[in-house]
Amino acid sequence: MDPLIDPCVFVDDDGQAYIYNGGGQICKGGKLKDNMVELDGEMKEMEGLEDFHEATWIHKYNGKYYLSYSDNHDENWNDGVKGDNRMRYAISDNPLGPWKSMGIYMEPTDSYTNHGSIVNFKGQWFAFYHNS
Protein backbone atom coordinates (compact mmCIF):
# COMPACT_ATOMS: atom_id res chain seq x y z
CA MET A 1 0.00 0.00 0.00
CA ASP A 2 1.24 3.49 -0.81
CA PRO A 3 1.87 5.91 2.07
CA LEU A 4 -1.42 7.34 3.35
CA ILE A 5 -2.15 11.04 3.81
CA ASP A 6 -5.13 11.83 6.06
CA PRO A 7 -6.54 8.28 6.09
CA CYS A 8 -10.23 7.77 6.80
CA VAL A 9 -11.99 4.48 7.57
CA PHE A 10 -15.71 4.10 6.87
CA VAL A 11 -17.74 1.05 7.97
CA ASP A 12 -20.93 0.59 5.95
CA ASP A 13 -24.25 -0.69 7.30
CA ASP A 14 -23.40 -4.24 6.16
CA GLY A 15 -20.15 -4.22 8.15
CA GLN A 16 -17.86 -3.80 5.12
CA ALA A 17 -14.99 -1.45 5.95
CA TYR A 18 -13.36 0.91 3.45
CA ILE A 19 -10.25 3.06 3.68
CA TYR A 20 -9.68 6.37 1.90
CA ASN A 21 -6.77 8.75 1.68
CA GLY A 22 -5.47 11.47 -0.53
CA GLY A 23 -3.02 14.17 -1.26
CA GLY A 24 -1.42 15.76 -4.26
CA GLN A 25 -4.81 16.16 -5.96
CA ILE A 26 -5.57 12.41 -5.88
CA CYS A 27 -8.06 10.66 -3.60
CA LYS A 28 -8.08 6.87 -3.40
CA GLY A 29 -10.35 4.36 -1.72
CA GLY A 30 -10.51 0.61 -1.27
CA LYS A 31 -12.16 -2.24 0.61
CA LEU A 32 -10.55 -3.56 3.76
CA LYS A 33 -10.46 -7.22 4.78
CA ASP A 34 -12.27 -8.25 7.97
CA ASN A 35 -9.06 -7.74 9.98
CA MET A 36 -9.16 -4.05 8.93
CA VAL A 37 -5.38 -3.93 8.39
CA GLU A 38 -5.19 -5.45 4.90
CA LEU A 39 -6.69 -4.31 1.62
CA ASP A 40 -9.22 -6.55 -0.10
CA GLY A 41 -8.08 -5.68 -3.63
CA GLU A 42 -6.46 -2.54 -4.99
CA MET A 43 -6.99 1.07 -4.00
CA LYS A 44 -8.74 2.98 -6.79
CA GLU A 45 -8.86 6.64 -7.63
CA MET A 46 -12.10 8.37 -6.65
CA GLU A 47 -13.56 9.87 -9.82
CA GLY A 48 -15.68 13.02 -10.05
CA LEU A 49 -14.14 15.13 -7.29
CA GLU A 50 -13.55 18.80 -8.02
CA ASP A 51 -10.35 20.54 -6.86
CA PHE A 52 -9.39 17.75 -4.40
CA HIS A 53 -6.49 18.46 -2.02
CA GLU A 54 -6.65 16.23 1.11
CA ALA A 55 -8.65 15.52 4.30
CA THR A 56 -11.05 12.83 3.02
CA TRP A 57 -14.08 11.95 5.15
CA ILE A 58 -16.98 9.61 4.29
CA HIS A 59 -20.41 9.40 5.84
CA LYS A 60 -23.75 7.94 4.75
CA TYR A 61 -27.07 9.77 4.86
CA ASN A 62 -30.44 8.59 3.50
CA GLY A 63 -28.80 5.79 1.51
CA LYS A 64 -26.26 8.05 -0.22
CA TYR A 65 -22.53 8.24 0.41
CA TYR A 66 -20.98 11.64 1.05
CA LEU A 67 -17.27 12.26 0.52
CA SER A 68 -16.09 15.54 2.01
CA TYR A 69 -12.61 16.95 1.56
CA SER A 70 -10.40 20.00 1.63
CA ASP A 71 -9.86 21.77 -1.70
CA ASN A 72 -6.74 23.23 -3.30
CA HIS A 73 -7.86 26.82 -2.53
CA ASP A 74 -7.18 27.81 -6.13
CA GLU A 75 -10.13 30.17 -6.59
CA ASN A 76 -9.68 32.25 -3.45
CA TRP A 77 -6.21 33.70 -4.04
CA ASN A 78 -5.47 37.01 -2.34
CA ASP A 79 -2.78 39.27 -3.82
CA GLY A 80 -1.02 36.31 -5.46
CA VAL A 81 -1.02 34.19 -2.29
CA LYS A 82 -3.14 31.07 -2.10
CA GLY A 83 -6.08 31.40 0.23
CA ASP A 84 -7.23 28.99 2.90
CA ASN A 85 -8.82 25.62 2.16
CA ARG A 86 -12.56 25.34 1.72
CA MET A 87 -14.50 22.16 2.47
CA ARG A 88 -16.22 20.51 -0.51
CA TYR A 89 -18.39 17.43 -0.88
CA ALA A 90 -19.51 14.90 -3.45
CA ILE A 91 -22.22 12.20 -3.39
CA SER A 92 -22.48 8.67 -4.77
CA ASP A 93 -24.66 5.57 -4.69
CA ASN A 94 -21.53 3.48 -4.07
CA PRO A 95 -18.86 3.96 -1.38
CA LEU A 96 -16.15 3.73 -4.07
CA GLY A 97 -17.84 6.11 -6.52
CA PRO A 98 -18.07 7.44 -9.08
CA TRP A 99 -18.78 10.71 -7.29
CA LYS A 100 -20.80 13.75 -8.28
CA SER A 101 -19.27 17.00 -7.07
CA MET A 102 -21.82 19.10 -5.17
CA GLY A 103 -19.70 22.14 -4.36
CA ILE A 104 -18.51 23.94 -1.25
CA TYR A 105 -20.19 23.38 2.12
CA MET A 106 -17.85 25.52 4.22
CA GLU A 107 -15.78 28.56 3.34
CA PRO A 108 -12.29 28.99 4.80
CA THR A 109 -11.79 29.37 8.53
CA ASP A 110 -8.87 31.32 9.94
CA SER A 111 -6.52 28.40 9.32
CA TYR A 112 -4.55 27.79 6.13
CA THR A 113 -5.60 24.12 6.05
CA ASN A 114 -8.84 22.49 7.07
CA HIS A 115 -9.93 18.94 7.80
CA GLY A 116 -13.56 18.18 8.56
CA SER A 117 -15.68 15.28 9.75
CA ILE A 118 -19.46 14.93 9.61
CA VAL A 119 -20.98 12.56 12.16
CA ASN A 120 -24.33 11.57 13.60
CA PHE A 121 -24.42 11.65 17.39
CA LYS A 122 -27.62 10.67 19.18
CA GLY A 123 -29.73 11.44 16.10
CA GLN A 124 -28.22 14.85 15.42
CA TRP A 125 -25.69 15.68 12.68
CA PHE A 126 -22.51 17.60 13.51
CA ALA A 127 -19.67 18.94 11.35
CA PHE A 128 -16.28 19.08 13.06
CA TYR A 129 -13.30 20.96 11.66
CA HIS A 130 -10.14 22.66 12.83
CA ASN A 131 -8.93 26.23 12.65
CA SER A 132 -6.21 28.24 14.35
Functional labels for PLM-detected ranges:
Residues 1-132:
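Carbohydrate-active catalytic/glycan-binding domains of CAZyme proteins
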